[in-house]
Amino acid sequence: SNPERQAYVAALAAERESGSAASSNPDPVLSLEVGRKRLRDAGGAFLDEGQVWTASLSQTFEWPERLRLRRAIADRQIEAAKLGLGRFEQALEAKAAVLAYRLSRAQVRAQACEEVAARFAGLRKALVGRDPSGPAPTIELRSVEAAEVVARRRAEEARLALQQALLEMNQLRGAPSLAPLTVKAPVLALKDAPKLEELLAAAQQGNFSYRMHVLESEQLSLQSDLARSDSVPGFTAGPYVSQDRVGGRETIVGLRFDIPLPVSGRSSAAERSANERRRQSKSAISAAWRDVEKDLGQTWLSYASKVDQLRMHKDDPAVRFSEAAKLAESHFRAGALSLQLFMDAQAGYLEAVDSALLIQEQAVEAGFRLRELSGVPFNPVASR
């Protein structure tokens, strides 16, 4: 139901239709000429007048080698359209997975901010009933109010991010923009990436950008061969019949044969131009492969780094800091903890949530980016 995917499917269908006609000769041409003829003698005296007409049927024939080259060029265009569709479907799947993760994590982030804001609101109400004598109670109250404002702002930002992710997800699904959607927050286990050497080997066939450069080079090579074959062009042949009814009836039946003469040098110029473009495309292939090696190496290192960071903690640091934030509240209300430590615990909880979710999101994106760059069916996320 995704409209962009339908556009790629339509483009592939169009290339297939064009390819089906690439290896066939043009349609025959029927020509008809009709006129009148007036016959006079040498002195200008009128002798006779009547109708004349000519009809011909002609067919242009291409040499088999030229038809083969045209079909091969069309096959490369079809393969390029298939690659485009496959790349889009792969990117669509990856984007849907990342958006689903982002949607669930935005819910977690919003809940954490609202939880902290509620704690500060409860503490603010408790501080209002204290004896306001001296500057310390007032400063403490204002500090708590400021922290509550910051927590509510972050909660609002998290809710906005949630709505933005929802809009993007509904666009991908082809659903109404504000259609409700709930995604359960998964407990993720990130897989180890394949070895970099394996990814690079697979990228020679699986990387879209590199494959497109290779296909373009192959297509230009075929076009160069096609331009070279212009020195032996196709020919047109067919029967014709003409009739003249002036001064009697004269009928002529014959065979017509036409062949272009390559005397202008256009075919050789086209061949030289195609050869230059082919050499240029080979240089572009080398540059494209260097880009693949660089992007794949950087993404592989980034993914491995993020996975190592997440595996440093056996449990979710956000959960551990959440428990510490709750414990800090109970101890502060009991008078066993200072206000500063209480506020530090709440701020640390929010920072831990943001950091953990950000690293997880970056790891998921890097994992799917590895799949996009290499073409390996690697799913970085495994639900526990």
Annotate each language-model stretch with its function.
Residues 1-6, 13-28, 55-73, 82-90, ...:
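A glycine-/polar-enriched beta->alpha junction
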Residues 124-141, 324-342:
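Alpha-helical hairpins and coiled-coil heptad-repeat segments
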Residues 353-384:
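Acidic, low-complexity, intrinsically disordered peripheral segments
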Residues 31-66, 70, 182-195, 235-273, ...:
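Small/polar, glycine/serine/threonine/aspartate-rich low-complexity segments that form flexible
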Residues 304-336:
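C-terminal hydrophobic structural anchor segments
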Residues 71-75, 138-147, 339-347:
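Short, charged, amphipathic alpha-helical segments
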Residues 85-206, 299-306, 349, 356, ...:
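Periplasmic alpha-helical coiled-coil/stalk elements that build and connect Gram-negative outer-membrane
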